[in-house]
Swiss-Prot record:
GTP binds at residues 231-236, 250-256, 275-278. (6S)-5-formyl-5,6,7,8-tetrahydrofolate binds at residues 27, 84, 124, 442. It comes from the Bacteria. Belongs to the TRAFAC class TrmE-Era-EngA-EngB-Septin-like GTPase superfamily. TrmE GTPase family. It is found in: Cytoplasm. PROSITE patterns: G_TRME. The gene is mnmE. Its EC number is 3.6.-.-. One of its GO terms (cellular component) is cytoplasm. Binds 1 potassium ion per subunit. Signal peptide: none annotated. Homodimer. Heterotetramer of two MnmE and two MnmG subunits. It comes from Brucella suis (strain ATCC 23445 / NCTC 10510). This is tRNA modification GTPase MnmE.
Length: 442
């Protein structure tokens, strides 16, 4: 990413989807935006009004004719002069327009996330809002979209700014007691009240972190692993859940050697379902590796579906794991004398029990996620800094034998950690990581 702070260049990029398309949108931002208009359109449109103009190269050749909008600074997404050119979405048209823009002095193609990074640098958004926009663009389910919108709407920033202000106010009381202890207009010994306020804030942050676990599940998805002996019907179940033939189905035992994963959208919640190698004793080195991977994936699962053929000898065994495990009896169409041993009975041949199992999976996912609050930490970066904030608050509260100056310093550090979440203080080292998650043109 280019050096942040100066932004002498004017950047441009294709912001719409893959070509060819009905319409292609090219965005521009920077100090040369008006010059671009004068060169390519020979006119600057009325601000915020669509104008139908011909776009020309520097030698006067017409590139295309389309709509364009001019947005003068500072009331724009980036805070700079901005423009949009709406062209026909042919590959040759767009490539020619981009080439012409690249030939103009002071103009260059934007890097990934550079429009949003400029918006951050110019005070148009904080880091949590930028991260929310990245999540919104990446959202694939309704639940992920809602969560991303909550963050992008600024709810996190409001909460963290309020907490930071409470820390600053508390620290001001302590420093007032230090500096003006002999003055009559300073309340006597405000320290006790401050520690009580900090204790309440600490509990709020702890609760907030706990709610972040559910948000992380919604953002990253829940993981369901299908296990069982060879030919228990694992691959058939995966194919049903996926709605297509993902796994090879064969009478030959041990067909599945590696992990096969599909992504489901269950009520707006992303759920990753993994088919694994059949669990059994084997001399095959390749199959052994597959079984080891299956056991490793089980250890990371939120839910394990343990399948057993109901038509064969009953030998229900479940490996000891922390994840919740459901016993699923398969091949129900072939009968079975011990059906009460299993939580669900299914048949991929007749479809019996499959919709019931799918409904149960959705109910499990919804219960696991629960009700997401308006402001939750959605990134591990947030949680790490919140934990660091709590640690400094605890030092301040519990430091009875320490000078007030040191406890005030703990409070300063706590407010600084909160400021790092929103980008108000000392975040240069993480900017490249955050904004590289955006596509070019955003």
């Amino acid at each position: 990413m280019s050096e942040i702070g100066s932004y002498h260049d004017t950047i441009f990029a294709l912001s719409s989807g893959r070509l060819p398309s009905g319409v292609a949108v090219i965005r521009i931002s920077g100090p040369k935006t008006r010059f671009v208009y004068e060169t390519i359109c020979q006119a600057i449109p009325e601000p915020r009004h669509a104008a139908l103009l011909t776009f020309r190269s520097r030698n006067g050749d017409a590139i295309d004719r389309g709509l364009t909008l001019f947005f003068p600074a500072p009331h724009t997404f980036t805070g700079e002069d901005c423009a949009e050119f709406h062209l026909h979405g042919g590959k040759a048209v767009v490539e020619k327009m981009l080439a012409v823009l690249g030939e103009l002095p002071g103009c260059r193609i934007a890097e990934a996330g550079e429009f949003t990074r400029r918006a951050f640098a110019n005070g148009k958004m904080d880091l949590t809002i930028a991260e929310g926009l990245a999540d919104l663009i990446a959202a694939e389910t309704e639940g992920q979209r809602r969560l991303a919108m909550q963050v992008a709407s600024g709810n996190q920033r409001k909460l963290y700014s309020e907490w930071r202000q409470r820390l600053i106010n508390a620290r001001a009381f302590i420093e007032a007691e230090l500096d003006f202890a002999d003055e009559s207009d300073v309340p006597g010994s405000v320290s006790m009240q401050v520690w009580q306020q900090l204790s309440a804030l600490k509990h709020e942050i702890e609760y907030h972190i706990a709610s972040g676990k559910r948000a992380a599940m919604l953002r990253d998805g829940l993981h369901v692993v299908i296990v069982g002996a060879p030919n228990a019907g694992k691959s058939s179940l995966l194919n049903f859940l996926a709605g297509r033939d993902v796994a090879i189905i064969s009478e030959e035992a041990g067909t599945t050697r590696d992990l096969l994963e599909v992504k489901l959208d269950l009520g707006g919640i992303p759920v990753y379902v993994t088919d694994t190698a059949g669990l059994r004793e084997t001399d095959s080195l390749v199959e052994k590796i597959g079984i080891e991977r299956a056991r490793a994936r089980m250890a990371e699962a939120d839910l394990v579906l343990s399948l057993e053929d109901m038509s064969g000898p009953v030998s229900v065994t479940v490996e000891k794991i922390e994840a919740e495990t459901w016993l699923i009896g398969t091949k129900a169409d072939l009968g079975g004398s011990a059906s009460g041993l299993w939580k669900y009975h299914i048949s991929t041949m007749t479809g019996s029990g499959l919709e019931q199992l799918l409904d149960a999976l959705q109910a499990f996912a919804e219960a696991k996620i629960g009700q997401i609050e308006d402001a939750v930490p959605t990134r591990q970066r947030h949680i790490n800094l919140l934990r660091a904030t709590i640690e400094e608050i605890e030092k301040a509260i519990e430091g009875d034998d320490l000078p007030l100056e040191l406890r005030a310093e703990n409070m300063r550090l706590a407010s600084q950690f909160l400021g790092r979440i929103t980008g108000d203080v000392d975040v240069e080292e993480i900017l490249d990581v955050i904004f590289s998650q955006f596509c070019i043109g955003k």
